[in-house]
Regions:
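Tight coil/turn sites that cap or link beta-strands
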Residues: 22-25, 54-56, 60-62, 69, ...
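A short glycine-rich, His/Asp/Glu-containing loop-to-beta-strand
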Residues: 1-28, 92-136, 167
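Short hydrophobic/aromatic-rich beta-strand segments that constitute the beta-sheet cores
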Residues: 46, 74, 128-129, 148-150, ...
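Short acidic-glycine-tyrosine-enriched beta hairpin
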Residues: 47-62, 152-184
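Double-stranded beta-helix
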Residues: 67-99, 154-164, 184-186, 190-225
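Cytosolic regulatory regions built on CNB/CRP/Popeye-like sensor folds
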Residues: 1-2, 33-35, 47, 53-58, ...
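Glycine- and acidic-residue-biased ligand/ion/polar-headgroup-sensing regions
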Residues: 25, 31-47, 133-158
Length: 225
């Protein structure tokens, strides 16, 4: 049985999808993947372990079943070895990165193959106008209302962009964006927003073309203390 109301957001070097778990059915997953399951609503049972909203589970090379009444987001990559793990993280225990515009929760820590983050931006704030040289990412807006800012003329170099070169689109709950390397983008929060992002693991690959706090490119060590 597959997840009900399944939505697929990405099928590239990683897979990213969501769906509902129904009390009347059991969903069984094969064991040939490295997966992260993030419960965002309700609660469910995974092999006798209860996941409540905000809890996550990392599973590798393990066949498992889920049942309950919940909505989950799942990120996965094919497994390339025979190692096993089954790692539970309770809500409130995920690695947190404080940002000037809000914060990030690293749902699967610093996994070497893919990243899964919850990103919160508070009303009236915005992330950097940025691009990535290698990182590919898929951003789902779970809660709130935002504006998606992007460069609509590819003939202009990212580092030479001015405000007149940028376009703006509504970005609302339930929308998602797939961002490939070199694509200039920014999210501006019209309300408090919560996004769920899955990406390739180049977490320090951030080129900030404009930043309200004038932060440099790459990882900001002070945000990780």
């Amino acid at each position: 049985m597959i997840l009900k109301n399944r939505r697929v957001y990405a099928d590239c070097s990683y897979q990213y999808y969501s769906g509902a778990i129904d009390l009347s059915d059991v969903c069984t997953f094969d064991g040939n993947y490295e997966r992260t399951i993030y419960c965002v609503e309700g609660s469910c049972i995974v092999d006798n372990l209860r996941l409540n909203a905000g809890d996550s589970l990392e599973v590798k090379n393990h066949v498992f079943s889920i049942y309950g009444d919940a909505y989950v987001f799942i990120a996965q990559v094919p497994s390339t070895d025979n190692d096993h793990y089954f790692k539970y993280t309770k809500a409130g225990d995920h690695y947190k990165v404080t940002k000037p515009w809000g914060y990030e929760l690293w749902i699967n820590g610093e996994h070497p193959k893919y990243a899964f983050k919850e990103i919160v931006i508070t009303e009236g704030n915005q992330c950097s106008l940025q691009y990535h040289n290698f990182k590919e990412e898929t951003i789902y807006l779970y809660e709130g209302l935002a504006t998606w800012v992007y460069k609509d003329d590819d003939s202009i170099n990212n580092d030479d962009v001015i405000s007149d070169d940028l376009a703006h689109l509504p970005f609302k709950s339930g929308d998602f964006k797939h961002v490939k390397p070199k694509v200039l983008h920014r999210v501006k929060a019209q309300t408090d927003i919560k996004m769920l992002e899955v990406s390739t693991p180049y977490l320090n690959d951030v080129i900030r073309v404009q930043d309200d706090q004038h932060r440099p490119d790459g990882k900001i060590e002070s945000e990780h203390k």
